[in-house]
A protein has these predicted regions:
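C-terminal ends and interior cores of transmembrane alpha-helices
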Residues: 126-141, 355-373
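Extracytoplasmic gate region of multi-pass secondary transporters
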Residues: 37-41, 269-329, 389-397, 401, ...
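Flexible cytoplasmic loops linking transmembrane helices in multi-pass membrane transporters
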Residues: 4-17, 68-85, 240-293, 342-358
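Conserved MFS/SLC helix-loop-helix module at the cytosolic interface between two early adjacent transmembrane helices
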Residues: 103-145
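Cytosolic juxtamembrane N-terminal segment immediately preceding the first transmembrane helix
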Residues: 1-87
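Central mid-sequence intracellular linker of multi-pass
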Residues: 178-180, 187, 204-273, 279, ...
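Cytoplasmic helix-loop-helix junction between adjacent transmembrane helices
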Residues: 147-190
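Glycine-rich segments within core transmembrane alpha-helices of 12-TM secondary carriers
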Residues: 161, 177-208, 212-224, 320-329, ...
Length: 455
């Protein structure tokens, strides 16, 4: 631990309090996690050569293709598309990440509570970054099977992300700041989707090699790990250069800021019997069903149904997540203001925002399923859908901090790990329902998925 003199000197170098530095680095952590998670969703459209399937199957309902993929009336081969994978194989590969992701949630939450969130989160994301760098080499050497295994390992590295972040936030953020900080940190998911989609499209535009996508985001993950290791700590009391004023403030306002005392074991029996926990679980499953459908299959929808080229697909795929990110701050600010002015309780605020984030997107996706080849209408519905989903972060996403701040990691691990089943099922299900590359039928599939999700 630094001497008080040096701690005061270093703390003056920061223009903002350390809890906000942590919030920004947490945002970048989630951003980094999501770029490595979603980059394959766009890259796979350029990895697979579906020319043969498109030539052998005529779909009279397909949208007109005016993209640069048409040459003399036929679909040209993609220069770096060296794999011949069926739609079901692609769906299985896209879902592989979530197998590993679900497995390490509970162990990740336990490790974060036992040893602190800093290294649990940092080492997990570092491993995912290294696996991302290796993706081009592995898939060229072992094909779909090796890629599936690698994606499972990537998911295992990212599994502790949310539980570890919840532990860190529970020990750093006062209750009245949690909606805004939650929107800031977990809004990083949308920044990751925006950045990942846009940069993937940019790197693959023209004759760009899809391998560059994995090299770029793998290096980005390693750079984040270096910054996280230097700037962030698990608790305020272990931070070497937090100001005395902020340390005193956090110890007075955050009940779990001091972790020196021995904690009781996680009360799993009480958690499982808790009605609010079950409500939280059902809300998470419903949200993730629609969210993972969008994340994994929106790029394929843009490319194979609406016939956008890869550069346009990258940009247009990013737009709904930009709307979700902006609206997550708006929802978070509104919730905090209403609670602070006692217009409604924290519980009521969580219910309102979760309801908006669940029913609104389902309605918009159903409307998008009937937009047909109207590109502008489809994109508008997707943007509106994700914008309304922004209420999720100030709703049930931070609810674990309210229900059990001392066990937020374990509770988040249970909720996130269980709801990840949606990410396992939806990509493979859509792949099975669209065996031919004429994925115009995916429009109806997405509509049905939304209806199942909304009950």
């Amino acid at each position: 631990m630094l001497s008080p003199k040096w701690r005061r000197t270093i703390s003056r170098l920061f223009l903002i309090p350390q809890r906000y530095v942590l919030g920004i680095m947490g945002l970048l952590a989630v951003c980094n996690a999501y770029t490595m998670r979603v980059c394959l969703n766009l890259a796979v459209t350029q990895m697979v050569n579906n020319t043969k399937s498109q030539e052998s199957h005529y779909d009279p309902n397909a949208c007109p293709d005016d993209s640069d993929l048409l040459v003399n009336g036929t679909v040209s081969s993609k220069p770096h598309a060296i794999f011949d994978w069926s739609e079901s194989t692609q769906g299985l590969i896209l879902s592989a990440f979530y197998y590993g992701y679900a497995i390490t949630h509970v162990p990740g939450g336990y490790l974060a509570e036992r040893y602190g969130g800093k290294w649990t989160l940092g080492i997990g994301l570092l491993s995912t970054a290294l696996f991302t760098l290796l993706t081009p080499v592995v898939v060229k050497a072992g094909g779909a099977t090796w890629l599936f295994i690698l994606r499972v390992l990537q998911g295992m590295g990212e599994g502790p992300t949310m539980p570890a972040l919840m532990i860190v936030l529970a020990r750093w953020v006062p209750p009245h700041e949690r909606s805004r900080q939650g929107a800031l940190v977990f809004g990083g998911a949308q920044i990751g989707n925006i950045f990942g989609s846009f940069m993937s499209g940019f790197l693959m535009a023209g004759d760009g090699d899809w391998a560059n996508v994995f090299y770029f985001f793998g290096c980005f993950g390693i750079l984040w790990f270096l910054a996280w290791s230097l700037l962030c700590y698990s608790t305020p009391n272990t931070h070497p250069y937090i100001s005395d004023e902020e340390l005193k403030y956090l110890n007075e306002t955050v009940t779990s800021a001091d972790t020196k005392s021995v904690r009781d074991p996680v009360p799993w029996k009480a958690i499982v019997r808790s009605v609010p926990v079950w409500a939280l679980l059902f809300a998470a499953v419903g949200h993730d069903w629609g969210y993972y459908t969008m994340v994994t299959d929106l790029p394929k929808y843009m490319t194979d149904v609406l016939k956008f080229n890869i550069a346009a697909t990258g940009t247009l795929t990013a737009m709904p997540y930009l709307a979700m990110w902006v609206c997550s701050f708006i929802f978070g600010w509104v919730c905090d203001v209403c609670v602070k002015r006692k217009w409604h309780s924290i519980k009521t605020g969580r219910i309102i925002h979760t309801t908006v984030a669940a029913t609104g997107p389902a309605i918009c996706i159903i409307l998008a399923s009937y937009s047909g080849c109207d590109r502008y209408a489809a994109v508008a519905y997707f943007i509106a859908s994700m914008a309304l989903m922004g209420g999720f972060y100030s709703g049930m996403k931070v609810n674990a901090l309210d229900l059990a701040p001392n066990y937020a990691g374990s509770l988040t691990a249970m909720i996130n790990g269980t709801s990840t089943i949606s990410g396992i099922i939806t990509p493979y299900l859509i792949g099975l329902l669209t065996p031919d590359v004429s994925i115009f039928y995916i429009i109806r599939v997405i509509g049905r998925v939304a209806r199942w999700c909304s009950g």
